[in-house]
UniProtKB/Swiss-Prot annotation:
The keyword Membrane does not apply. Pfam families: UreD. It comes from Synechococcus sp. (strain CC9902). Keywords: Chaperone, Cytoplasm, Nickel insertion. UreD, UreF and UreG form a complex that acts as a GTP-hydrolysis-dependent molecular chaperone, activating the urease apoprotein by helping to assemble the nickel containing metallocenter of UreC. The UreE protein probably delivers the nickel. This is Urease accessory protein UreD. GO terms for cellular component: cytoplasm. It is found in: Cytoplasm. GO terms for molecular function: nickel cation binding. Belongs to the UreD family. InterPro entries: UreD. Required for maturation of urease via the functional incorporation of the urease nickel metallocenter. The keyword Cytoplasm applies.
Amino acid sequence: MQRLNPWHGTCRLQFSADADTTHHQGGCTAPFKLMRAERGNDGRCELPLLHSAGGLVGGDQLSVDLELGRNSRALITSVAAQKVYGSIGRSRLHPKGTWANQSVSCRLGSNSDLEWLPQELVVYADALVEQSLDVQLADDASFLSAEIVRLGRTAAGEDLGQGCWRSAVSLRRIGENGTRWEQVDRLELSGDALHHRHGLNGDAVFGTLIWAAPAPLTNPTLKSLLTNARNDRAGLEGQMQCSRLEQGLIARYVGPSSRDARFWFSRIWARTRAQRQLSEPRIPRVWPLQEQPLRQQVFIENIASSNAATH
């Protein structure tokens, strides 16, 4: 599938705090649409984005630009899974295919808090897609992202074919002492990497959660957080690993189930909320879940550990 005139959709949003509530302003161009915002228990602005075109084809570009002012809190998600259709061999003009691109840029002011939680990306056979996430945050800001990608429609017996998925992530702290890198991540999945035991080993789902905490975590606090996150893997299928960042944590999922990836990441999300002494998260109303991923014991266990919270 190839459009003669590819989309270049943009979404630019600014968030500002007023007392205990965060407000947003800005706008989008087609095919983006903003849905109705909700207020979380902590005054957070919870905002779903709709991609009205139904999917991306080669040449399409999506750009999301988010700016959070001092003390503001926001949660951004998507209304549905994003689809990227095959590009290779679909056009006589570009028989080798053209790349679809999605870029997300975030700037977080002092004491701000952003949760970037889009629904999964489904990459069809022979699709070419690049994603980038660039985050600049103040020393005392918090940023959490969880992104899941399914390579091929496995329910239809399809794999990625000749397609390719690329991802670039960079997180930088901007403070009085200059800039320091929190995380730099470059990934490419295609060809042999999909089947090699050091790649996806034949599985179709890959996910990454990153939490950049608002303050350094003590060793006992971080050890407890990682131990609890590993315990949260119980009952879920796939390979799940988590480790520390300089000021936060990173978790990876490789397996057959986007549902299990989302469940595990949701449980870690709940733990990061408790660590910040915030209200327990509310699953976004647009997520099509038939089960509750946040088990009750998640919050019971966290009550004790939250006494060691650093922020």
